[in-house]
């Protein structure tokens, strides 16, 4: 600029560019350009948005803090109220205690009187007992009452001592039977599982043993009473007999064991608390008595002395219960692991299924740790199985760990097939209506074109960075490489054409292709790299252009090498507008210029160009963008104008149906889907989609895609004849004649429907989104489908199982518009979506 100033000061009348020099040495004025102003506005808008987001985050944090403090204050108030209530209760209790202490003296006198009355009652009772005992001495039949009075007291004393000794023996016997010993015999080994049949089989024998024991006890008591009666004085026989009847009554009151088959209550409690054991029949009898197998056990028992049963009982475990169930010494090594079989825990044996009695049970830990389900009882509280539970829980933990490992591997495998957010493409100021892969760039860094309501067409390159790696700005946002301007309104549709990539050029196309855009201004504009304004404009529609599609063929393949529409290498472009017409254009192909290649230092060892060898995906650096527009002329010819006879509905989407471009399908706002012939422009098929039309736009078709890959669910992966592909994926013929393939449509009523292109019948429909379906895109192999909806979500579908494999909420809703467009890259690596929030997001597996 200094040089410009010199020219201005010394050469009057010579002005350089836009510099306003006045010769006074003032600095030149700043030169403003539209692109610079727009860039400044975008930068300021993004800064404002960042500040607003930061303020929103801080606002939410402050709200959370305020809510936390309010909650703490409420808790403090509640605690204070509770403490006040507690203090009032304590004060009330103190008052009651003081009142009770004051009235304590009066109550003490009343208690003394009550104690005096009780003592008097006790004295009266003792006097009555003495009166009952005195008449017995008069029944001795002696002639002299004085002698009887003198001799009576020592005889009564001796009889009382003998009775006391007998009662002490009885009490010791019952105490031994009813009270658990302080130091029981330690258990020897873990008891096996009990079988109720063992108890029921030995019930009869146990009852026989119990009756034998009762009879022996009765005979022993009778012998003892006879000996005591013979040793007593003849003058006191009547008194001894009367006193003998009285302790027998006391014995019946304490425990009626000699009279009935029911055990004493204390003994029943002991038996209920004792551990249970399942063993062989001989072992049961050996644990009770050593001579348990002798049939005449009761006879031999009667011939033993009185002390023999006591000594035998002292050596033996607790006796058999009256109900036939046997307590035995547990075999567990720990008392905490003992069985706890309570009578209430056993169900009625008659109501339970009969297990097999002849079963052999081993004490091996490998078999005891995992018992058969048929041998398990239904009683709870199995303390002795705690070690079994531990081993079982250990096995469960091992199985759980193995299951977690298998789930982890499956989860890792599933995560490898899930798409995740990678980059955000920023730059648009309004809704982004459409997004496409332009075909430019490199395999590692493909180029994306976007357009929206701000009237701009932007080019982006997906950076070839590792997952989660951030750029120099510290975020995952990617700025636009170039911006095209020329539409006077919103840009509603995009389409691209680029030459096929070549292996010799590292996967790059031979030159850059065209970008076609349809706008609200009813024009179709053609864009090329490095040129801000459009290369050409196609006029012919009278309303907004909503759909564009480049057919995978050329003019010569459809109309022949010699035709009236132009050279055979021209591209066929199909457009649909709100005026209800569909037009087929033949446009010039871009020049086949080789894009600039990287230098020798950027090549690999074998001379092969790496996929990520260019920073921006092609030879053109991202900043600044050079002007590489060609000077080749652009020509176009209108081939067909297709208009429906009885409908003014607007076309909403266009897709090629056949891989060779001979047919294409068009969807309309009135839910119609029609297949047209490219050569003649005539309608050759109609889908049965009008059956769901209700006369409003609520059932319109928003998106349509087509594939010739067989979607038969019974068809295996190896049963297809994969062919080279156009944009629809390529594949085998489904119908065998006529129109081939399957047409998939996304509707405003939230449904996705499948139509057979040959018959036109709907073969499958599914409710796909909570909101209307806005866009569809097929994977390159034709086996997966991604759908976008205004519910702000993307859903991935398996066309073989017709099931959703992944769902993600990726955009924010803006004026009722969620995700507006979605596209799947030709290599299947990337999925790109655009939404009403002005964002373009890139996903990868």
Curated annotation (Swiss-Prot):
Its main location: membrane. Residues 104-125 have a biased composition (Basic and acidic residues). One of its GO terms (biological process) is sporocarp development involved in sexual reproduction. It is a peripheral membrane protein. Keywords: Calmodulin-binding, Coiled coil, Membrane, Repeat, WD repeat. SUPFAM superfamilies: WD40 repeat-like. Residues 97-159, 238-406, 589-632, 710-737 are annotated as: Disordered. Residues 46-85 form a coiled coil. Residues 724-733 have a biased composition (Gly residues). InterPro entries: G-protein_beta_WD-40_rep, Striatin_N, WD40/YVTN_repeat-like_dom_sf, WD40_repeat_dom_sf, WD40_rpt, WD_repeat_striatin. Residues 332-348 have a biased composition (Polar residues). The keyword Repeat applies. GO terms for cellular component: membrane. Residues 385-398 have a biased composition (Basic residues). Pfam families: Striatin, WD40. Residues 238-254, 610-626 have a biased composition (Low complexity). SMART domains: WD40 (SM00320). GO terms for molecular function: calmodulin binding. Signal peptide: none annotated. The keyword Iron-sulfur does not apply. WD repeats lie at residues 427-470, 486-537, 540-595, 647-686, 726-765, 768-807, 814-845. Residues 147-167 are annotated as: Calmodulin-binding. It comes from the Eukaryota. Binds calmodulin in a calcium dependent manner. May function as scaffolding or signaling protein. Required for the formation of mature fruiting bodies during early sexual development. Belongs to the WD repeat striatin family. This is Striatin Pro11. It comes from Sordaria macrospora (strain ATCC MYA-333 / DSM 997 / K(L3346) / K-hell). The gene is pro11.
């Amino acid at each position: 600029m200094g040089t410009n100033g010199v020219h201005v000061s010394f050469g009057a009348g010579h002005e350089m560019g836009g510099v306003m020099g006045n010769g006074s040495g003032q600095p030149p004025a700043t030169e403003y350009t539209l692109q610079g102003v727009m860039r400044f506005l975008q930068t300021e808008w993004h800064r404002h948005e960042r500040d607003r987001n930061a303020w929103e985050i801080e606002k939410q944090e402050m709200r959370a803090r305020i809510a936390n403090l309010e909650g703490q204050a409420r808790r403090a108030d509640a605690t204070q109220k509770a403490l006040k209530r507690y203090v009032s209760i304590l004060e009330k209790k103190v008052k009651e205690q003081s009142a009770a202490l004051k009235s304590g003296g009066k109550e003490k006198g009343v208690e003394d009187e009550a104690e005096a009355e009780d003592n008097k009652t006790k004295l009266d009772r003792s006097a009555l007992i003495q009166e009952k005992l005195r008449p017995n001495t008069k029944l001795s039949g002696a002639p002299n009452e004085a002698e009887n009075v003198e001799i009576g007291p020592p005889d009564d004393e001796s009889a009382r001592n003998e009775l006391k000794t007998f009662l002490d023996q009885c009490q010791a016997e019952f105490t031994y039977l009813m009270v658990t010993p302080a130091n029981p015999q330690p258990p020897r080994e873990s008891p096996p599982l009990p079988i109720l049949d063992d108890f029921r089989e030995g019930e009869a024998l146990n009852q026989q043993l119990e009756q034998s024991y009762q009879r022996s006890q009765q005979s022993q008591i009778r012998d003892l009473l006879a000996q005591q009666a013979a040793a007593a004085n003849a003058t006191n026989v009547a008194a001894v007999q009367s006193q003998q009847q009285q302790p027998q009554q006391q014995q019946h009151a304490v425990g009626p064991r000699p009279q009935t088959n029911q055990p004493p209550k204390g003994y029943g409690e002991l038996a209920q608390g004792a551990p249970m054991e399942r063993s062989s029949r001989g072992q049961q009898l050996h644990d009770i008595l050593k001579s348990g197998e002798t049939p005449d056990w009761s006879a031999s028992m009667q011939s033993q002395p009185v002390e023999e049963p006591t000594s035998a009982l002292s050596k033996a475990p607790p006796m058999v219960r009256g109900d036939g169930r046997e307590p035995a010494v547990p075999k567990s090594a720990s008392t905490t692991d003992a069985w706890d079989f309570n009578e209430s825990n056993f169900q009625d044996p008659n109501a339970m299924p009969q297990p097999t009695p002849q079963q052999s049970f081993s004490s091996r830990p490998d078999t005891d740790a995992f018992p058969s389900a048929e041998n398990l009882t239904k009683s709870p509280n199995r303390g002795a199985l705690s070690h079994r539970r531990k081993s079982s829980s250990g096995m469960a933990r091992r199985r759980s760990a193995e299951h977690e490992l298998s789930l982890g591997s499956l989860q890792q495998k599933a995560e490898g097939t899930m798409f995740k957010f990678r980059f955000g493409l920023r730059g648009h100021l309004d809704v982004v209506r459409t997004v496409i892969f332009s075909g430019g760039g490199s395999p590692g860094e493909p180029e994306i074109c976007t357009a929206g309501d701000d009237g701009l067409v932007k080019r982006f390159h997906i950076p070839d960075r590792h997952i989660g790696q951030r750029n120099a700005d510290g975020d995952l946002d990617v700025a636009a490489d170039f911006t095209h301007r020329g539409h006077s309104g919103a840009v509603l549709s995009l389409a691209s054409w680029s030459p096929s990539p070549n292996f010799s050029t590292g996967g790059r196309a031979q030159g850059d292709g065209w970008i076609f855009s349809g706008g609200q201004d009813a024009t179709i504009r053609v864009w090329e790299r490095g040129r801000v304004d459009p290369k050409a404009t196609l006029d012919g529609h009278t309303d907004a252009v909503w759909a564009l599609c480049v057919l995978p063929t050329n003019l010569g393949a459809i109309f022949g090498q010699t035709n009236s529409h132009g050279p055979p290498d021209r591209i066929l472009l199909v457009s649909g507008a709100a005026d209800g017409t569909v037009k087929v254009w033949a446009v010039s192909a871009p020049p086949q210029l080789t894009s600039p290649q990287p230098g020798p230092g950027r090549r690999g060892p074998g001379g092969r160009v790496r996929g990520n060898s260019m920073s921006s995906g092609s030879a053109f650096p991202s900043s600044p963008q050079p002007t590489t527009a060609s000077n080749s002329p652009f020509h176009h010819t209108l081939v067909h104008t297709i208009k429906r006879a009885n409908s003014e509905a607007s076309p909403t989407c266009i897709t090629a149906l056949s891989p060779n471009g001979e047919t294409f399908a068009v969807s309309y706002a009135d839910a119609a889907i029609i297949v047209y012939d490219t050569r003649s422009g005539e309608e050759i098929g109609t889908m049965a989609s009008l059956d769901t039309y209700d006369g409003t736009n609520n059932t319109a078709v928003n998106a349509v895609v087509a594939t010739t890959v067989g979607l038969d669910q019974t068809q295996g992966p190896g049963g297809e004849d994969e062919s080279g592909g156009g944009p629809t994926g390529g594949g085998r013929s489904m119908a065998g004649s006529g129109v081939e393939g399957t047409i998939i449509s996304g509707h405003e009523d939230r449904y996705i429907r499948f139509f057979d292109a040959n018959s036109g019948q709907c073969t499958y429909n599914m409710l796909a989104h909570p909101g209307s379906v806005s866009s569809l895109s097929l994977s390159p192999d034709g086996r997966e489908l991604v759908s976008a909806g205004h519910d702000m979500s993307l859903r991935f579908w398996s066309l073989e199982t017709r099931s959703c494999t992944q769902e993600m909420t990726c955009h924010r809703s803006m004026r009722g518009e969620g995700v507006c467009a979605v596209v799947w890259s030709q290599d299947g690596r990337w999925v790109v979506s655009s939404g009403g929030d002005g964002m373009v997001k890139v996903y990868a597996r």
